[in-house]
Curated annotation (Swiss-Prot):
One of its GO terms (biological process) is protein glycosylation. It comes from Arabidopsis thaliana (Mouse-ear cress). This is Probable beta-1,3-galactosyltransferase 2. Its main location: Golgi. It is a single-pass type II membrane protein. Its EC number is 2.4.1.-.
Length: 407
């Protein structure tokens, strides 16, 4: 009896184990089936696989982040093609630089005119007469630095090397040469000194009035204002500053400047390097002497102040930066300082600083006519109002030289 029961128990145990295994296998299959159904989500009709072009683009982006791949590409490039690209880039930069320079000069001109009008400065009548369509390129603008007390000097220049009346207009129209006496205004605008200049200007019409208070210690500021104002009024190749006690041969000056017309950033004059004077009370004392080093040092090379010329781009540079250019006690030093930190061509021409007769006379007889003549001992022609006619007679180039000259 017990054996029978034991056999039945064994048979049931076997059957239960078999069904257990089958159930496990079935559950596993069902689980796998539902799992695949959940993860295999149908793709949306709006989605697409990346195209070949997109795949290539991804590849390029990934390679662009790989320095090694970039290096290999650059090495494989044709050297001539690289040089061509460099040359094209250089040309493009030059064109851009010229465009920027032109825009800067136009901006400077507009700014100078606007400031003059806003400040109500007693400028020359030429400013009001100037119209945009009338603007032309001149050879040079010659500004004769003068003072309220220098009426006799001005008259002596009008009687010698500065053409008057219709001849001066002809000089502007045919030769492209502008000549003006340059002066500012007194501390009391509209006073007797200003009225005297206005009356003289009505008679001769040869003044350029500046928005500047006259004073010997303000020559650096006057020089800066002159170049800025002249640049805003006349488009010229060169801008010249000369003192009113110096004799000038205009044709020779023009021929000298024309030789340098194609050069950029030209600064022409008799270059010198005098001592920096730290002692108070002496002439040409430099209050900021300590900026030039130890006692006994000399200034950097700069053109002597009796006569010098700068090219158009340098006049533009002064006009644009006039509010930040530092002024030293001596105006010729100031001008040299403004150019010391930029790429400027300094031209030392000793014909711009000849002595009075017999020096300039001997040179004229030898065929080497001087551009300017004066006495070094007086920083100009000594007693110029009385002696300049004699200098003109013995050292002048002659009126025919001016009208026959071609610039």
């Amino acid at each position: 009896m017990s054996a029978k029961i034991k056999g039945e128990y064994s048979s049931r145990s076997f059957v239960s184990r078999k069904w257990t295994i089958l159930l496990c296998l079935g559950s596993f299959c069902v689980g796998m089936f539902f799992t695949n159904r959940m993860w295999n989500i149908p793709e949306s009709k709006g989605m697409s696989h990346p195209s070949v072009t997109e795949a290539e683009r991804l590849k390029l982006v990934s390679e662009g982040c790989n320095p090694k791949a970039l290096y290999q590409k650059e090495v494989k490039r044709d050297p001539q093609a690289l040089f061509g690209e460099v040359a094209n880039t250089h040309i493009a930069l030059q064109t851009l630089d010229k465009t920027i320079s032109s825009l800067e000069m136009e901006l400077a001109a507009a700014r100078s005119v606007q400031e003059s009008l806003q400040n109500g400065a007693p400028l020359s009548d030429d400013m009001g007469k100037k119209q945009p369509q009338e603007q032309r390129r001149f050879l040079m603008v010659v500004g004769i630095n003068t003072a309220f007390s220098s009426r006799k000097r001005r008259d002596s220049i009008r009687a010698t090397w500065m053409p008057q009346g219709e001849k001066r207009k002809r000089l502007e129209e045919e030769k492209g040469i502008i000549i003006r006496f340059v002066i500012g205004h007194s501390a009391t605008t509209g006073g007797i000194l200003d009225r005297a200049i206005e009356a003289e200007d009505r008679k001769h019409g040869d003044f350029l009035r500046l928005d500047h208070v006259e004073g010997y210690l303000e020559l650096s500021g006057k020089t800066k204002t002159y170049f800025s104002t002249a640049f805003s009024m006349w488009d010229a190749d060169f801008y010249v500053k000369v003192d009113d006690d110096v004799h000038v041969n205009i044709a020779t000056l023009g021929e000298t400047l024309v030789r340098h017309r194609k050069k950029p950033r030209v600064y022409i004059g008799c270059m010198k390097s005098g001592p920096v004077l730290s002692q108070k009370g002496v002439r040409y004392h430099e209050p900021e002497y300590w900026k030039f080093g130890e006692n006994g040092n000399k200034y950097f090379r700069h053109a002597t102040g009796q006569l010098y010329a700068i090219s158009r781009d340098l006049a533009s540079y002064i006009s644009i930066n006039q509010h930040v250019l530092h002024k030293y006690a001596n105006e010729d030093v100031s001008l040299g300082a403004w150019f010391i930190g930029i790429d400027v061509k300094h031209i030392d021409d000793r014909r711009l600083c000849c002595g009075t007769p017999p020096d300039c006379e001997w040179k004229a007889q030898a065929g080497n006519i001087c551009v300017a003549s004066f006495d070094w001992s007086c920083s100009g022609i000594c007693r110029s109002a009385d002696r300049i006619k004699e200098v003109h007679r013995r050292c002048g180039e002659g009126e025919k030289a001016l009208w026959s000259a071609t610039f």
